[in-house]
Amino acid sequence: VKMTWILGFLLLSIALGLPDLAIGQQIASGSEADVDVTPDVVYGRKDGMALTFDVFRPSNAHGGAVLYMVSGGWVSRWTPPEWLIAWSFGGLLEKGLTVLAVRHGSAPRYKVPEAEADVRRALRYIRLHSEELGIDEDRLGVFGGSAGGHLSLMLGLGSDDGVMGSNDEILRTAARVAAVVAYYPPVDLRAIVGPSERFPALDFAEEKAASISPILFASPDDPPTLLIHGDADMLVNMENSKVMFEALQGEGVESELIIIPGGDHGFRLPADRERAQQAMVEWFDRHLRR
């Protein structure tokens, strides 16, 4: 499918009545590059269901790519591709970055450890098939917000060289990225694991929490990591990003923490969204452009 991403934004704005989206300002002043969209690429299956991602490749693609974690409360919903272009990806596409929107098995059926395993498999698949996807496996970034930010940090900080001896070619492939951006991420699941009506994905065995808590994975070989958090976030306290930043700094990792004054969870104010989006795009452009 080929479409002009400005048109996608206009359709979204009309449908939702959102003319002041921060990304819309970027589109209005940007080029009219075409985007090739390949939806529903299958990277695995579980319980008879396909695990998929969508590929958004701009006409000015240079090989760098960003995996977007489609996750809120560790629920991964399908969204029309043209909406994603307008809502989240315009600035990245304008910079020549290919974007891959990765979905995982969702709560309440699947819990956080399973969601993390899904997106890790997606990363391995993407690296294994990087040539046919038209991207450079050594110039991959990952980003997301909230639960998606948590998963992004796990992929970035919990990298591995693959499961040696596995019969699965995908599992034998390394899971590594070159840059991370996380908006308002929970970083220590040990404190919040257990039965939860609002977040059923957290209802899993307590002893597994440490293995999916990014705060425990900071190490000197971690990729450049940008954290963005609002100081008025009432859902995921800003301390999450602060302690994560301190841990990364302590290991000598290139990292930055942006605190948005008055920013809430989700950056609902257009100015907050614009600041976060601009910082995210600049971070990936700096670290993924050859």
Where is each model-derived feature located?
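N-terminal cap/lid segment of alpha/beta-hydrolase-fold proteins
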Residues: 26-61
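C-terminal catalytic histidine-bearing segment of alpha/beta-hydrolase fold enzymes
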Residues: 54, 228, 238-290
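Short beta-strand element of the alpha/beta-hydrolase
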Residues: 63-73
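Serine-hydrolase catalytic-loop signature spanning alpha/beta hydrolases and amidase-signature enzymes
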Residues: 73-76, 80, 99, 125
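Short amphipathic alpha-helix adjacent to the substrate-entry channel of hydrolases
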Residues: 80-100
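Primarily recognizes the serine-hydrolase "nucleophile elbow" in alpha/beta-hydrolase
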Residues: 121-194, 209
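Active-site nucleophile elbow and catalytic-triad environment of alpha/beta-hydrolase enzymes
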Residues: 166-167, 203-217, 222-223
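Short beta-strand/loop motif that positions the catalytic acidic residue
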Residues: 227-229, 233
